[in-house]
């Protein structure tokens, strides 16, 4: 693809998103890198409709990376209960502690 083809393609994708894209998901409101990061981890192998209530509860308890890093792993896992793939929660917690 030429640069002009790439630009045209990118413009078409962005135009489509403006018309059809979801813009009201919880992680799209008051967007921060932390909120997007948590949502992306939760959304791995899990449907959006399933993630939303878990995400909201998780954010209420762990509103920022510091709160997540300082929490005991058992509490993080408790808030993850029902989402499955618990390695995601353990790795998220470890990463928060590294940050």
Swiss-Prot record:
Which keywords does this Swiss-Prot/TrEMBL entry list?
Answer: 4Fe-4S, DNA damage, DNA repair, Glycosidase, Hydrolase, Iron, Iron-sulfur, Metal-binding
The lineage's top-level taxon is Bacteria
Q: Where are the transmembrane segments?
A: none
* Reaction catalysed by this enzyme: Hydrolyzes free adenine bases from 7,8-dihydro-8-oxoguanine:adenine mismatched double-stranded DNA, leaving an apurinic site
The alphabetized list of GO BP terms reads: base-excision repair; mismatch repair
**EC number of the protein:** 3.2.2.31
Molecular function in Gene Ontology:
4 iron, 4 sulfur cluster binding; 8-oxo-7,8-dihydroguanine DNA N-glycosylase activity; adenine/guanine mispair binding; metal ion binding; oxidized purine DNA binding; purine-specific mismatch base pair DNA N-glycosylase activity
Q: Which family does it belong to?
A: Belongs to the Nth/MutY family.
Assembly notes: Monomer.
Tell me what this protein is called: Adenine DNA glycosylase
Native species: Aeromonas hydrophila
